[in-house]
Amino acid sequence: QAPDQQPGFRSNPWWVMVQEHAVEKEFEANDWALERLKHGASGLLFYLYDHQYLPRILRDIDLRYIQLGLVVEGSGPEVMDALLHHAHNEILPLDQMNGFLNTDPVEIAARTGHWDESKMYDLGELSRLAPPKFKYMCVNANFYGACGASASTQLGLALAHIDFYLEAFGEVGLEQYWLALSAGTHMFEEMAKIRAMRLLWGRLLETYGLPQVHLEIYTETSIQHQSALDVETNLLRAASAAFGAITGGADALQIRPYTAVLGANDAEAERLALNQHYLFAYESF
């Protein structure tokens, strides 16, 4: 097995340092993105509600050098088509685009109580449209963590979630799987959880008789572990969660701002969250 198939290894030496933004006004989102990139973020995650605004959001951003994440409630193929048009207009080689388009039928059904079969057809269409390094088989197991699931419950539900897609799609899109987990403050438990997930992924592929491929794991520090009464201490909570995720081998990590529990957009809190990435990177050099 290649080293990145072993528990505790990520596909690249450094994790992707992600920051997120819910798009309300496209030009404000673009200003935010350029500012975050200026401060050193290597991954941008957008919650997107209208694919028509995508070129405005991505203006002056060179997608060859960052990981782009798009969380979509509407039509995934329409958003992917808009992204491909943007890449064509920017003369951007598709094989140099890195990121994911997140439209997860199972998580949407769990969150809303409504199963939409058309979302499964969207995944089939994305298998035709998506660039080779752009993930689209997304498993949002962080939703279960946000609902209060323990580490073992998160793993069990994530595995069932992946199994559903493997049963439906088989080897189609096998290299395009992307898993989101939430990270709590028990750092050793988080290390073990991510490493165990890689072992379970390998065992599941073996059971289906499928080739061993790398599973992209994205982790975000949990808001459920933040305090609304003493928000500054959330920096310490985030540090414990992030340390566990990084040491466990997460490919990408979002450290949530210490004010996230208040639902506030705070530029200073975002800056400090990004600085925590730098501290971990510096200390592990």
Regions found by a protein language model. Name each.
Residues 150-155, 185-196, 223-236, 263-273:
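Short glycine/threonine-rich loop-to-helix capping motif typified by GTGT followed
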Residues 160-167, 231-250, 274-281:
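Glycine-rich and small/hydrophobic secondary-structure elements
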Residues 203:
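ATP-dependent phospho-/nucleotidyl transfer catalytic cores
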Residues 240, 251-285:
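Active-site or pore-adjacent capping/gating segments
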